[in-house]
Amino acid sequence: MEVDINGDSRSTLTTLPLPVAEGSSPGKAEAEKPRCSSTPCSPMRRTVSGYQILHMDSNYLVGFTTGEELLKLAQKCTGGEDSKGEAMPALRAKQLDTGLARSSRLYKTRSRYYQPYEIPAVNGRRRRRMPSSGDKCTKPLPYEPYKALHGPLPLCLLKGKRAHSKSLDYLNLDKMNIKEPADTEVLQYQLQHLTLRGDRVFARNNT
């Protein structure tokens, strides 16, 4: 017996269509892979086709239940035919409650993976993940001497000088006026004169 997300039962199908979903999913296998290798606990797994999604919140955290649990709930519900009218709202509320509880529990257990975490040491070196735009990182860095005393500089100060930052968040590429043609022209001019000077030196040495 299959149950909707809202809890409405569909009595037309007695079993979950697992082989059909597994057989006709060549493109679905790629979509069920984890979105990023840095999230070790991704809810997208290969067994999603055999699961019933109960609840999904805005963070794409999903509360699952297996087909066996749904069949047990259906057998409990259909065991008393006379009390079917009272059992259906209770079943619906119970499923929604379990979905909410499971999704919140998933969020609690996985919330630590959203903060910067230490990558395991490789060859004795300790590497750290690049801080994202939401992280507060005000450590004095060797390649950013102006950030030692204060936080990230505002946009008006960054427009005049080049931002020597490895993070693209400080570049503000959508708001900057990029003057690439002038730079390329100057570089081409300098390169041309350098090559001419080099040719003269080599010609002078050859003669």
From Swiss-Prot:
Keywords: Acetylation, Cell projection, Cilium, Cilium biogenesis/degradation, Cytoplasm, Inflammatory response, Phosphoprotein, Protein transport, Transport. GO terms for biological process: cilium assembly; epithelial cell migration; fibroblast migration; inflammatory response; negative regulation of cytokine production involved in inflammatory response; negative regulation of epithelial cell migration; negative regulation of fibroblast migration; negative regulation of inflammatory response. The modification N-acetylmethionine is found at M1. Residues 1-41 are annotated as: Disordered. The modification Phosphoserine is found at S25, S167. InterPro entries: UNC119-bd. One of its GO terms (cellular component) is ciliary transition zone. The keyword Phosphoprotein applies. Highly expressed in photoreceptors. Belongs to the UNC119-binding protein family. Regulates the macrophage function, by enhancing the resolution of inflammation and wound repair functions mediated by M2 macrophages. The regulation of macrophage function is, due at least in part, to its ability to inhibit glycolysis. May also play a role in trafficking of proteins via its interaction with UNC119 and UNC119B cargo adapters: may help the release of UNC119 and UNC119B cargo or the recycling of UNC119 and UNC119B. May play a role in ciliary membrane localization via its interaction with UNC119B and protein transport into photoreceptor cells. Interacts with UNC119 and UNC119B; interaction preferentially takes place when UNC119 and UNC119B are unliganded with myristoylated proteins. This is Macrophage immunometabolism regulator.
